[in-house]
Each structure stands twice: as structure tokens, then as C-alpha cells.
Amino acid sequence: MPAPQKDGPRANRDIRGVREVQLIDDTGQNRGVVPFFDALNLAEEVGLDLVEIAPNSVPPVCKLLDYGRFRFNEQKKQNEARKRQKTVEVKEIKLRPGIDKHDYDTKMKSVHRFFEEGDKVKVTLRFRGREMAHQDIGLRLLERVKSETAEIAKVESEPMLEGRQMIMILAPR
């Protein structure tokens, strides 16, 4: 059974099958192509680790540095990148065909706020009872929402009827 792979770059004696390496010292100076064991001895003399930076190049590029600090900084960078990553949520706004002007304006304020936050908006228009006979009213309402948000949003999914509700999905531009 092969040994488990370590995550991250190889260091010191973990670097195998290499006779010579392109060495970069702790000050960032390129020392050129050096025999592997000379580079390893130099790392031990200075009290640092020989870390393989570019394993696929010929010869591999190795650098003298503190491996523990290097791993810590890499982990810190990954955590920062994870924090900056924004998950896009889909917020839902529910409307009815007979919605009043003030209620409509309030819903539209919410829609604008969701777009400012970078979220997608699912506009759901629910029909009840005999309202199903007047789907054109619902379609006009969704077209009105689409035209009012045209500058700040794009339509990801056109209005379509699913059962007793008409759904449209908008995404911020």
C-alpha cells in the first residue's frame, strides 16, 4: 500500500527522484542549478527547509524557507479567499394579481434592495380560485416588474406557469 499523499508542496527529504534543483535562497536570490544534496545541506546549515515550489519544471524549483510559516501563510490566504467568497441567494417575492399600488411599491423596494445585496429574485405570482381564468392580468404584472427592473436586473427565466402560480427569476446585472 503506497504512503498517503501529503497536501501541499514537498519539503526536505520528501523531495525524491531529483538529482539537481533550481535553488532560490532565503533572500529571494536565484542560486542557479545546484545538486539536490548540496541544496539540502545548505538548508540545514541556515536552519531553514528546502521546499519544492515548482515540481513540474525541469529541474524543479526549490526555495529555502521556514516550512511551518509557509504552511501557516498558505492556510491564512485560503481562509481569506473563503471569507471573500459570496454565495448568491435566491430571494422570493410573492405577489397576487389584484395587488394594490402601495403594496406593489413596497415589494419593488424589497426587490431593489435584494439586487443591491447581489442576490437573485424569484417573483412568484399566485392565482386563487377564479383568478386562473385571468392569467393575462398576472402576465402583465410580471411584465411590469420586468420593465421596472430592466436597468438593474436581467431576466434569467421568463414568466412561466407552474400549477397555480406564475414564476419569473431575475438576476442582478
UniProtKB/Swiss-Prot annotation:
It is found in: Cytoplasm. InterPro entries: T_IF-3_C_sf (IPR036788), T_IF-3_N_sf (IPR036787), Translation_initiation_fac_3 (IPR001288), Translation_initiation_fac_3_C (IPR019815), Translation_initiation_fac_3_N (IPR019814). GO terms for cellular component: cytosol; membrane. It holds the Pfam family IF3_N. It comes from the Bacteria. The keyword Protein biosynthesis applies. One of its GO terms (molecular function) is translation initiation factor activity. Keywords: Cytoplasm, Initiation factor, Protein biosynthesis. GO terms for biological process: ribosome disassembly. NCBIfam families: infC. Belongs to the IF-3 family. Monomer. IF-3 binds to the 30S ribosomal subunit and shifts the equilibrium between 70S ribosomes and their 50S and 30S subunits in favor of the free subunits, thus enhancing the availability of 30S subunits on which protein synthesis initiation begins. This is Translation initiation factor IF-3. The lineage of its organism: Bacteria, Pseudomonadati, Pseudomonadota, Alphaproteobacteria, Hyphomicrobiales. The gene is infC.
